[in-house]
Amino acid sequence: TEMLVPQSRGTQIMVTAIVLAAGVGSRMKSEKAKQFLEVAGHEVLYYSLRAFDEHPGVDSIVLVTKEEFVEHCQKELAERYQFAKVRDICIGGKERYDSVYQGLSAIGAEGENDIVLIHDGARPFVTAEMISASIACARECGACTVGVPAKDTIKIVDTDHYGVETPERKFVYQIQTPQTFQVPLLRRAYETMYEAKRNGDTHNITDDTMLVEQYAGVRCKVVEGAASLKDIL
């Protein structure tokens, strides 16, 4: 598509949401990708797009999906509901981090203080409060994520599945999205990661907080989420 994300204007901080909708939902016994399943009269992805589109602190949305879903996202979501902030629809990559990088590349030139929120489109219950808290935290700390305290006891196990450590539950959080970063920091972490992978790095990267910790040496602060924000599977 030929939609363009606005560039940084002077000292104004631009805030972009990258919404990931390239998954196929292999854990759900459904022929339809989970982000397009209907919940309360709308597709799951609709709710995330609406939350970011309506938030006054978000300037634009980049939606990342599979090639076969681009037209559907354009016509049945962005145009049908007049989500004016959806400025680009990108085709995702092989891994989750590849899809994020596609979205990041679509943002274009960034100001040094610009912010990007990365959100899983299969988490429909993101709130305006979570978005606001994430933007504020990333502006201050550089990197943050939404998360909730773990309700279950967590065990660290070895390769033989014997427990080797039981962390105190008050220090254990289940990490959700959005995950929010200063754009230059995240871009730098991605460039370092891809360079490392070209040189044989085999780390399994499961989310962007891990990527930033591993390849930029930056700790991510946790913003309080909600149990309802879980992925719908």
Model region roles, listed by residue range:
Residues 4-9:
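Short, low-complexity intrinsically disordered segments enriched in A/P/G/S/L with frequent Arg
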Residues 13-71:
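N-terminal glycine-rich phosphate-binding loop and ensuing alpha1 helix
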Residues 55-57, 79-85, 109-110:
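Short helix-capping segments at alpha-helix termini
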Residues 71-77:
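Acidic helix N-cap motif at the loop->helix transition within catalytic regions
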Residues 88, 94-157, 176:
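Conserved beta-loop-beta/alpha segment of the NTase-like Rossmann-fold superfamily
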Residues 155-181:
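Short, flexible, basic/aromatic active-site loop/helix in glycosyltransferases
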Residues 174-233:
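Conserved alpha/beta core of the MobA/IspD/sugar-nucleotide pyrophosphorylase nucleotidyltransferase superfamily
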